[in-house]
Structures are given as C-alpha cells and as structure tokens.
Amino acid sequence: MRFWTSAAAAEILRRDEHVVRKLLNPRVYSKLVNAFSETETKLRSLCEDSNPQLKNAVSVFQQAVDSGSSLAFAGNNLMAKLVRSRNHELAFSFYRKMLETDTFINFVSLSGLLECYVQMRKTGFAFGVLALMLKRGFAFNVYNHNILLKGLCRNLECGKAVSLLREMRRNSLMPDVFSYNTVIRGFCEGKELEKALELANEMKGSGCSWSLVTWGILIDAFCKAGKMDEAMGFLKEMKFMGLEADLVVYTSLIRGFCDCGELDRGKALFDEVLERGDSPCAITYNTLIRGFCKLGQLKEASEIFEFMIERGVRPNVYTYTGLIDGLCGVGKTKEALQLLNLMIEKDEEPNAVTYNIIINKLCKDGLVADAVEIVELMKKRRTRPDNITYNILLGGLCAKGDLDEASKLLYLMLKDSSYTDPDVISYNALIHGLCKENRLHQALDIYDLLVEKLGAGDRVTTNILLNSTLKAGDVNKAMELWKQISDSKIVRNSDTYTAMIDGFCKTGMLNVAKGLLCKMRVSELQPSVFDYNCLLSSLCKEGSLDQAWRLFEEMQRDNNFPDVVSFNIMIDGSLKAGDIKSAESLLVGMSRAGLSPDLFTYSKLINRFLKLGYLDEAISFFDKMVDSGFEPDAHICDSVLKYCISQGETDKLTELVKKLVDKDIVLDKELTCTVMDYMCNSSANMDLAKRLLRVTDDKEERDK
C-alpha cells in the first residue's frame, strides 16, 4: 500500500504507464489507476478554463495529500493554472503546501514561483529562484528573464535590468524584442529618456530590430516629456523605413501637441489619420476634445464632438467629462449641467470625476445648495461621493461663511459609514475657514480631533494655525505648534518659516524672527524676499535703521535681490530718520537694479519733502510720478496743492493744475472747490480754472 501512495509510484505511472501495466496484474493496476484518476479528474474539472474554481481545487489537492496521495503532476498543473489566472498570492501559498508535502516540483512551477515573487515586488527572491532552477539542472529561458526584467523595471531598478540583459548575452541567452522593450519602457517611465534611447540603439546594434511597440514606447515618452520635435523625428524615421505608425502612435503625438498647446499641429495629425482611411477611436477624439477645452476653445471641441458622433463613435464618460470640464472652465455652468443631463439620457453613467467638476464649479460660484443637490443625484445614481467630493463641499461651505454646516458635514464623515472618512485636506478646509472668521478656539479643537484621528496634520495645517495664532497674538500656542512640527515627521518648508517670521515681526518679537531667518539661511531653505521685507519693515518701524541696513546688505550678498517693496521700506525708513542722502542713494540703487519707483515710492518721497518744507523737490517727484503714468491719489494731490496754497505759491499751483488737467486727472470735489476758490481770489489763469471744473464735470457725467 505504501508503494501505491508514494511520489515515486505517481511519477512512474505518469511516465511509464505501459511498463507498469505489464508488471502488475489487471486487478492491481486498476486499483493503482483509480487511486489517482478520481482525484485528478476532479482537479481537472475544477481547473477548466471556462469556469475555474481554483480555491476549491487547492482544497481538494490538500485533502488528497493529507490522505497520503501524491499528485505531483496535478499539483504542478494547478500551480501553472494559479499563476496564469494572476492569483499570485494563492499560487505562492500553494507552492509552500507543495514543499511541505514533498511534492515533486517541476520547471513550470518554479517559473510560476519566479513570477509570484516579481508580482510581490520581491525581485531578490526571484533571482534566488533562478539559482534554484540552475541547481536542479533546469535550463531557464528568455521568458523567465523577461519576467524578472519586468519586475526590476517596475521597482525602478532599471540599472539592474540592463545588467541582467548583458548577463543574458554573456550566457548566450539572447534577449528578444520583449526583453529590450521592457527595459526601454522602464527608463521612459522613470523619465530617463537618454538612457532609453541609448539602450534602444544598443538593441539595434545587437541585431534585434525595433518593433512597432519600441517606436510607440519612445514616441509616447518623448511626447509626455514635451519633446515634440524629437517625437516627430521618430515618426519621420518610421515613414522613411517604410513602417506605418498605428493609431496608438498617432494618438500619443496628438496628445503631446495638445498638452503643449499646439492644437493646430495636433489637429493636422488627426486629419492625417482620417486621410489614411483609419478610424480614430474614442481615445483619439477625447484627446483632441480635451486639448481644445484646455485652451477654452469650446466651439472647436464641440465640432469634434459632433464629428465623432457622425462617424459612429460613441462618446464615453471621458468625452463628456472633458467637455463638462471645458464648459466649467469658461464659466458656462448652466451648459455643463445640461450636458450632464444629456449624458445620463444617453445611458453614459457619469463617474465621480464628472460630478466633482460640476460640484467644484457650483461651489466656486457660491451655489453650495445646488452643489449639494448634485451630490444627492450622485448617490441616487449609485456613484459614491469620494473624499474629493466632500472636501469640495467643505471648502464651498467655508468660503460662504457657513461654518456650522461645514462642521456638521465633517462630523457626518466621521460618524456615518455611508460617508468617506475625512482626510487631512478635509480637516484643513474647516480649520482654514474657522481661522479666517477669527474662530481660532474652534479651529484648534478641530486640530486636536485631526491629531486624534490621523496622528498628525501636514505642513498646510501647521502653516494655517501658525499664521492664525500669531495673528491673534497667542505666541505660546504658536511655539507649541512649532515644537510639535519639530517632534513630528512634518518637514518644515519655506511657508512655515515665513508664517513664523511674519507673525513674530507683527507681535514685535524681532529677535525670535531674526533667529528664524538665520536658521533658515543655514538650512537648505532659501529665505524669500518677503521674509527679508517683513524684518526690514519691523526694524525700520522700531527705529533700528542700522540693523535694517545691515540686513539689506546681507540680503544682496545672499543673492536674494531686493524688490520694489524692499527699497520702499528702506527709503521710508531713511526719510523718517531724516536721512535724505541715503534715500536718494537708494533711488539710484533702485534704478541700477532695473527697478522703477511705484506709487508708494513717490508718495513717501513727496510727503516727506513737504513735511521738511522742500516744495521744489516734492514737485519734482510729483512731476516724475505723473510722467511715469501713475495717477496721484487724492491724498497726494491734497498734500501738494494745499501746501502750494498755504505758501502762496500761485505759479507753482498753476503749473501743477495744468499738468493734472492735461492728463485728465480728476480731483475730488472738496479739493476742486478749494483750488477754484484760491485761483479766483488770486491772479491765477481763469481759463485753466474753467478747464479744471470741466474735467470734474465730465467725470461726473461719465459716472452717471
């Protein structure tokens, strides 16, 4: 009996059935055959391609080996079936059962094991299987290596994949076109186009010709990288070699031109496809429609849509979604809703992306109630709203100031299983809304809830709260949040430092702000001009002009060039300190830096010179301001003209009024009356006074 149930008996029966038949009498032979045939017949039935029941087959196999049967052939066959069905976890588990029962494992099963390890992203173990094959005397083939190459590339280990290719050649196992295409695609997906092209040329040199797939991989990759000249060069080379690019290649090129905004060239390729007699598929049409919509060319997109229907190509969910997105992008929300209804009428079910586009537009338009109706429609049609849906709604409610409803929605997401669980973006939306409305205490409560549920927020969370706590003057809470960032895995970015520097400057804690700026400078993060300007402004306000100058000079040494705001801060600080010489040198430095004074610069200079009694200098800057195209505001005009009146400078007043009238610059009513009254009571030019009045009257007429 032991002989009948041994692994050896099973193998002998398989390989040498005629020998066994001669050695055993008919009764014994019949018993031996029946011992295996019943189980194996059942296994074959369970593994039939038409209706595979592989889990049941594994159970039957396990029961058979538990009862002492050896089913090596059936086991290896089942292993192959499991791998072919892509049920890799079950296949791996089954392989271990085969090992435990001492079942003979053949080459096919080891090949399947190799594929399992690759699918499980364990390429190191897959290499071990190759070694095991070699140890057992099996000659592994190109197919095994191709599986391994695919695994390496999927793990972004393309360098190892190239080494394996070369090792194959050294072992006289020539890589085939699939081998090369796998690694070329890996390099392309990793955006290493030069290496992909280098390997493709090496492929040619090894005597392995490029297939249409090779051309397609390269063209698609160069299109995605926006290198359209190179991609078109490949197409030209294909044509020169007598190869005909397929629709996939043309679609890649059309998409590339659409992504680059070159719709004309994309449309020309589309027309070329039609001229060749090919029928573009929905993907090709969708690519072109999306391209036109992206540039707001809805008329052209609609024409392609109509042409698509005329040609008998059924628009799919992506077609409608692209058009709906385009309509929403140009503010045509009503038309987008009509298209959504048409889509449903045509039995093309919208997906979550389709609904989210419309919900987002409605929320941006402030129509949150309408957006909620779309969410209800979504549920009614059995499309489950996702996190993006609810996050859009949360943002819409917060933007509208309906924070109580936003809070209710967040708690529903937490408690109701029909809703998705909130993510960090959900919490951030509500925290930001509460902070904007100065409800910091509630925002901090939501933050505590976030930490309880998710463990920690992200940089956006901390930046919002740091800004708000410092704005509210709650320095202790801000420092507590800063410490939490330090203790957590959240990486502080420049926005985090900016929030702290700005906040501490506004609360007058300049030493802390300076310390943060220094810390930022020695880290990998480069302080922005805004960071420097915050400190410069605060130092000037507290009268620390010397420190401000040192920081201004350090800023330039660090290649963080001052902007107009930086110069304005320093000019204003210098003028307030009575240092006119420094203010003038700053104006020169501003010009050398290629910057022009703005309205703020001129305002500060004019007002400061007037306070110092330097009317000529003030008028000089007033003239420069007007000549530069800036329209002086009411405050500047009031200051300069009233100063002229107070000093009895009739001629200078007349010159200024003439310049303003010539430029059609209108004074406010009160100042016009003051100037008119002065001009009437002095020897001023009355024609000019009338012109000033006419300009004011004309402005009033235009405003009616």
Swiss-Prot record:
Alphabetically sorted, this entry's keywords are: Repeat
Gene Ontology terms, cellular component aspect? mitochondrion
**InterPro entries of this UniProt entry?**
Pentatricopeptide_rpt, TPR-like_helical_dom_sf
Where are the annotated PPR repeats, by residue?
A: 71-105, 106-140, 141-175, 176-210, 211-245, 246-280, 281-315, 316-350, 351-385, 386-416, 423-453, 458-492, 493-527, 528-562, 563-597, 598-632, 633-667
GO aspect biological process, one term: mitochondrial mRNA 5'-end processing
The Swiss-Prot or TrEMBL record describes its family as follows: Belongs to the PPR family. P subfamily.
Q: Which NCBIfam families match?
A: PPR
State the name under which the record lists this protein. Pentatricopeptide repeat-containing protein At4g28010
